[in-house]
């Protein structure tokens, strides 16, 4: 899903706009926008049979353009109280809960088995009784909703939504997968913990470069 970064950017802007009325509703707005874009991606891919990387690459540019347009012409003001939600313990609990829930779903539920089956072979999965289209759409919706949560985290950390919010996040996602040794083509042998390990390695590497004072160009090169 190459549109993850753009989803974060647009969901962050939506949350920023709604936060002036209600911060809890801003969370709902971020998750809702993310899930909605995920639904669009899933339907375009599953129902119209367009390759997922083509669909999500198109939506990546479309929604990034919307983020730039909205933030440039209609900047959103956020209340100072938004920083009260920038709580390390709270965010840690949310992340751990999401990771644990993802592990349980991926390893021990029917949905997880269906996802792995589709990754191994769509035709075989369909013959075994898996509703391929519905499962794919659901996967995109979940990914979009999680991007919405990330968008709210970005908002409470910076207090604003900018044109650069979530920019290049899709690249970081791919790097995390590769660092974790996960096959980007998926399949029955996919290891959920490899995703977590890859994300942690990328975070440690990025933060380490910042701590040693590496300039942005050097960081990007590495």
Stretches with model-predicted labels:
Residues 2-22, 27, 43-49, 177-189:
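Single transmembrane alpha-helix segments in multi-pass membrane proteins
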Residues 48-111, 137-138, 157-166, 218:
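Transmembrane helix-bundle core of multi-pass membrane transporters
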Residues 100-141:
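Membrane-helix/interface signature in polytopic inner-membrane proteins
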Residues 161-221:
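Transmembrane alpha-helical segments in multi-pass inner-membrane proteins
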Residues 60, 64-65, 94-105, 143-151, ...:
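Hydrophobic core segments of alpha-helical transmembrane domains in multi-pass membrane transport
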Residues 22-61, 197-198:
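Alpha-helical transmembrane segments within multi-pass membrane transporters and channels
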Residues 6-10, 24-32, 54, 92-97, ...:
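Hydrophobic alpha-helical transmembrane segments
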Residues 131-158, 167, 171, 175:
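Transmembrane alpha-helices
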